[in-house]
């Protein structure tokens, strides 16, 4: 399907209509199969979410199985597609490893992979730069690259707070 995502007057709009996100985080973990999630379990997850009036899901903290996005497209769940970027334990101050040059390529490539492989899914309404790491030049470069490829979706990043690298203020906890 087609859709237009925009932010006007601090309101998220999809196809010109205000959207109240009632979302959940989802890890690819199955109570029976561990890290192997069957298509049947994915469908069960979607049906439970729909029954609970959940309209959005964040793929935390990595891209999910490609079939998950196809199901979200089919069943009408909005998706925040999160890049495989997690830096717990690296700190959040100016000395954080995530701000250093040795992480620049990794942060950029993980965001590039996320956008390049998932771009055509209409369920994806937000790109996420990653989870809980410190803001800085590496994330600025990742955001700039995403915007060079796709200006049609807002960019989210939980630790950015109200900084320049997130179009949405969306504290997770």
Cite the ranges covered by each PLM segment:
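N-terminal carbohydrate-binding accessory modules
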Residues: 1-49, 70
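Substrate-binding/catalytic cleft of secreted carbohydrate-active enzymes
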Residues: 46-49, 56-173
């Amino acid at each position: 399907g087609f859709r237009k995502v925009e932010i006007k007057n601090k309101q998220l709009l999809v196809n010109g209509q205000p959207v109240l996100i009632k979302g959940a985080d989802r890890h690819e973990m199955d109570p029976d199969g561990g890290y192997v999630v069957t298509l049947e379990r994915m469908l069960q997850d979607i049906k439970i979410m729909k029954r609970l009036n959940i309209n959005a899901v964040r793929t935390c903290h990595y891209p999910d199985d490609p079939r998950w996005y196809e199901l979200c497209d089919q069943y009408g769940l909005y998706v925040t597609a999160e890049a495989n970027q997690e830096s717990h334990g690296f700190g959040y101050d100016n000395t954080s490893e995530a701000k250093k040059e040795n992480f620049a390529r990794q942060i950029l490539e993980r965001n590039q992979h996320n956008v390049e492989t998932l771009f055509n899914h209409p369920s994806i309404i937000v790109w996420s730069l990653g989870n809980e790491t410190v803001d800085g030049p590496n994330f600025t470069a990742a955001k700039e690259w995403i915007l060079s490829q796709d200006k049609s979706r807002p960019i989210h990043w939980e630790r950015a707070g109200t900084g320049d690298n997130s179009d949405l203020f969306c504290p997770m906890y």
